[in-house]
Amino acid sequence: MLLEFTKMHGLGNDFMVVDLISQRAYLDTATIQRLADRHFGVGFDQLLIVEPPDVPEADFKYRIFNADGSEVEQCGNGVRCFARFVHERHLTNKTNITVQTKAGIVKPELGQNGWVRVNMGYPKFLPNEIPFVADEPEALYTLELANDQNISIDVVNMGNPHAVTIVPDVLTADVAGIGPQVELHKRFPERVNAGFMQVIDDKHVRLRVFERGVGETLACGTGACAAAVSGMRRGLLANSVEVELAGGKLQIEWQEGDVVWMTGPTTHVYDGRLDLRYFQG
């Protein structure tokens, strides 16, 4: 069967977006892995699925699958692309939409020239909300790694779990070595996204993220939210912060006790069609 899709990206964090309202398809783990292959498939960090909502207050249901086929709760760069996609495909004429995710409701607002502002919901910090194994809540936790190496982390759930550590320079940070150890650490029973943040000043940080089930990506929207909120909680950052990632910049806003707002661009790369039979086992 032929499957129509759109390739999009948010700051280089790239997606295959599929409308399963107007067409039908079954995409299992192995099929998603084959589609994600950058040599033999479409190639992407995440697959984004548009479905009818299960709850009356939502306009759409938004499902996210990593390149390894695992389904995750949230993707910040993805929800911006999702919002642009449903509007450009005329699935809605709204510019403010309500989207159901595994993590709850998010509310993207479409702006000009592909920019989207998203209400990302409330951050969570308690260990059981991440989830993270700890005897009691603390401002920072020490994580033991291989070769007697320890790092200090904050933990934040932005619809998906994040560990944030501050580094002197993101360019020299050992993301490839430390990232997988943090992602798969036994204290994170559902694995975790590992963020490495360099504070430039109180309104500007640089960030690299090793994403759960993907590896390091050019940008991570929920990771940017988690890092900014972590810095704000520590008193290091103002309430509105520019987060600089390899793929570009996001603006993150947060007030204690309120929702997190993320603003950033989207890019529509191309529309495609493929014969799904070649990717199914």
Curated annotation (Swiss-Prot):
InterPro entries: DAP_epimerase_AS (IPR018510), DAP_epimerase_DapF (IPR001653). It is found in: Cytoplasm. It comes from the Bacteria. Substrate binds at residues 13, 46, 66, 76-77, 160, 193, 211-212, 221-222. Keywords: Amino-acid biosynthesis, Cytoplasm, Isomerase, Lysine biosynthesis. The record marks 162, 211 as: Could be important to modulate the pK values of the two catalytic cysteine residues. It catalyses: (2S,6S)-2,6-diaminopimelate = meso-2,6-diaminopimelate. The record marks 270 as: Important for dimerization. Homodimer. Belongs to the diaminopimelate epimerase family. NCBIfam families: DapF (TIGR00652). This is Diaminopimelate epimerase.
